[in-house]
Amino acid sequence: ELQREFGPLANDEVDRLGREVSAAELQAMFWKEYIDRTSPCALHHFHVDGVDGVFRCRASVLIEGTEVKIEGDGNGPIAAFVTALVHHARVSAFTVATFKQQSLSAGTEASALAFIQIKTNDERHIWGAGVDTNIELASIKAVISAVNRAATRPAPPASPPPPTIVPLPT
């Protein structure tokens, strides 16, 4: 699904450039679209504790440059962070629809690449991605990426109202 979302974006950029692009250029396009987004929301600090399957997130985010301290509970670090964002950072409600993660190389110091697809309250499915040597932070950064992408992508047009049927006079 991520390929279906990124493909048209990459094709538009290739068309704009008017030439084929290298693998490095394609990767740079991906990073610009998914990894490097810090507006309108950026992660400033993140901490999570868990006891008996309940996790509490304490974090601070920058919303359009203003620091906002957030706190939330959930059944895992991602759920706790989502709860905190929605309840304390003026972020529109959303749910996590898909979560995937992979290592970028071998070894204990390898960076993790996390992919998260969110479903917004207006039924859009938006992907985000995050990279960090800490797998939890990679996931949190992916949430931020998806939220930022959702904030900058227009909502689908409203459906037109159904036609009104007026009976003809007899």
Describe these PLM feature segments.
Residues 1-170:
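Terminal or standalone catalytic/regulatory effector modules within metabolic enzymes
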